[in-house]
Amino acid sequence: MDFAELVFKRIDESWIKAQDYIEWANELLEDGCEAPSIWQLAACSSDVPVDPDEVERLFQSCISELGLELPSDWYTALCAYSSSICENMLQGSLLPWECVTEMLAIADDHNEPYIHWIWIDLVDDLHRTTVKTTSVHFYSTLNLSDPEACIRIVAHQFVSLCSISLPERFPWIWHCEVCGAISKENTFTEVNSDTCTSCGGISTMKNLRFFEHRDVFLKNRHSGSSFVAPC
């Protein structure tokens, strides 16, 4: 269990046990970490029974000694955890479909935030490609005949999205590439572009369920473009 998973389960108050902290410390020791606080926390495995209060105290010492930071809110912790899964896959520690399975499990456990719908849409499109349907493809700009390559590309985008502040309900929103206006009109549609009711731009309001529009959204954010009030 890596740090991102540990702290998410901690803040989510789900499945977290004193033994999880001890296993995390042992994994750090195996990776070559020699911080005294890590040794002390790992040594708690020999305690019968394990004292949860002592484990918590030592965990806080580890955080301080290693210069780590605990996320202040659930959403930040979730994004860090989800990103770490993608990064592990991109680094070769996870297989692409293992990453997808993890993302879908998170989406199933947590209906919101909607950002994990990026993965639900990808799996749906890959399935549509396999059965050769004519349904809308949110990922039609990718080579869907190479699923693992698509998964890696989407993982790169997902990590970038998790690193910035996103509008409420993202990606279930429309975003104007000209004026930055946001609309929460229905995104479950084959229409991927529409007229912006704010600036009047023709086909400038983009459905962010579509992969290519999220790429443009990211570029606009990195270039310093800002959002205006929802229309």
Question: Where are the predicted features?
Answer:
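Acidic, Ser/Pro/Thr-rich low-complexity regulatory regions
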Residues: 1-231
